[in-house]
Design a protein with these regions (language model features):
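ATP/NTP phosphate-donor binding region
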Residues: 1-85, 329
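A glycine/threonine-rich phosphate-anchoring loop and its flanking beta-alpha core
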Residues: 13, 23, 106-202, 293-296, ...
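N-terminal small/polar loop signature for handling phosphorylated ligands or for N-terminal nucleophile
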Residues: 45-113, 118-119, 222-234
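Glycine-rich phosphate/pyrophosphate-binding beta-alpha loops
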Residues: 135, 242-275, 350-355
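Glycine-rich phosphate/diphosphate-binding loops and the adjacent beta-loop-alpha structural elements
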Residues: 195-250, 261-264
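Gly/Pro-rich interdomain helix-loop hinge
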Residues: 266-338
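Short, amphipathic C-terminal "tail helix"
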Residues: 336-373
């Protein structure tokens, strides 16, 4: 008799969900002498809603794919501010930087020291994560990704010391997210759930979160793209994103994200868009070895029942394209000459590729890029 694999599930110490709940942060924070908010120029517009006491500094120079230099600049800002509270106010890039900042600003450890799993020595600064997009689910997790532009690769840091003390899911903060960004980040949230659900490392407990996540995306993503102020849809996607973030902890993603990463580091596509472009092709590739679970995903997304591999790919492509996502790599500036480098880099990301239900050769990965071209 096989036993259920042992997993450790980390979640934020406190989670607040609901409209207007950004206003609850000040009550939770209590007496704070110095706060550093990590944001983008757009999300910095929400800082006043925090109503935090004491000194509040804002670092808003966070690009779509934060690099080592981004983290270094944020660390310099933190050492000047000496915060007793760090707030990540934004999407995944913002929250990933906030995690590392809270752990490293007053530490002798560097990014190189903590790269990998369970190398962060500790954290003395409180961390609040406030999601302003529904995609990465970074507010739920213990991982942070920073791009090394010289190597063209992502540096992954995983540690329970990166988990938030407080996470806030306030769907009102997502009303102004443009339709095309809503679409791409929504597919990213779905991909987290689907990749964990079909993974070689799938776990029955995480399957429950994954199911809730991709069902919510199937129900609400098109609605939110059509009407950004549809609160029910926006809130459903925030929950889907959070559930996807939970999936990343003990199970993680697989080939889909590995194949998407070079599109961010080398082609400089936003993370959600990169994942959306490859999602239909990876879903179809894995179908022969994950038939029951793939069929469940297809049903939840309204793709149909009893689909052939080719029909599944076509329907999933249609699902993404109907959301307004441009699904051609060529249209995003890629050339055919780029594809072998993308494939080699993606195939080398073994921490994700080894989770995939179907083994992929470099040629298989190249085939997915060509199908996406």
């Amino acid at each position: 008799m096989s036993s259920v694999p042992v997993i450790i599930l980390h979640q934020p110490k406190r989670l607040i969900v609901g409209a207007g709940t950004i206003g609850e942060v000040c009550t939770w924070a209590g007496e704070v002498s110095s706060t550093l908010v990590i944001a983008t120029p757009i999300t910095a517009g929400f800082v006043d809603r925090l109503k935090l006491p004491g000194k509040v500094a804002v670092f808003d120079a966070i690009p779509g794919e934060p690099e080592i230099a981004t983290l270094d600049a944020a660390l310099a800002a933190a050492r000047a501010a000496k915060p007793d509270l760090v707030v990540g106010l934004g999407g995944g890039s913002v929250m990933d930087v906030a995690k590392l900042l809270a752990a490293l600003w007053d530490s002798e450890q560097t990014l190189a020291d903590v790269a990998g799993s369970n190398k962060v020595a500790g954290r003395s600064t409180r961390l609040a994560q406030i999601a302003t997009t529904a995609g990465t689910g970074s507010e739920a997790g213990i991982r942070s990704l920073i791009t090394d532009p010289i190597k063209g690769a992502k540096i992954a840091v995983e540690s329970p010391h990166l988990i938030a003390d407080l996470a806030v899911l306030d769907a009102e903060l997502t009303y102004s997210v443009p339709p095309v960004v809503t679409a791409a980040t929504g597919v990213d949230a779905m991909a987290h759930c689907v990749e964990a659900f079909t993974s070689k490392r799938a776990h029955p407990m995480i399957d429950g979160f994954a199911r809730m996540g991709f069902h919510l995306v199937g129900k609400y993503l098109a609605r939110a793209v059509k009407d950004g102020s549809d609160h029910e849809a926006r809130e459903g996607l925030m929950l889907a994103s959070y559930y996807g973030g939970i999936c990343l902890g003990p199970v993680n993603t697989a080939a889909g994200h590995a194949i998407a990463y070079p599109l961010g580091t080398l082609l400089h596509l936003p993370h959600g868009l990169a994942n959306a472009i490859v999602f239909p092709h990876v879903l179809a590739f894995n179908e022969p070895v994950a038939q029951e679970k793939t069929a469940e995903v297809a049903q939840a997304l309204g793709l149909g029942h009893g689909l052939s591999q080719a029909k599944l790919r076509a329907e999933a492509l249609g699902f993404c394209a109907d959301l307004g996502i441009e699904m051609s790599l060529a249209k995003h500036g890629a050339t055919e000459a780029d594809l072998p480098r993308f494939a080699a880099d993606a195939h080398a990301i073994r921490r994700l590729m080894d989770n995939n239900p179907a083994d992929m050769s470099v040629d298989d990965v190249l085939g997915i890029y060509r199908a996406s071209f």
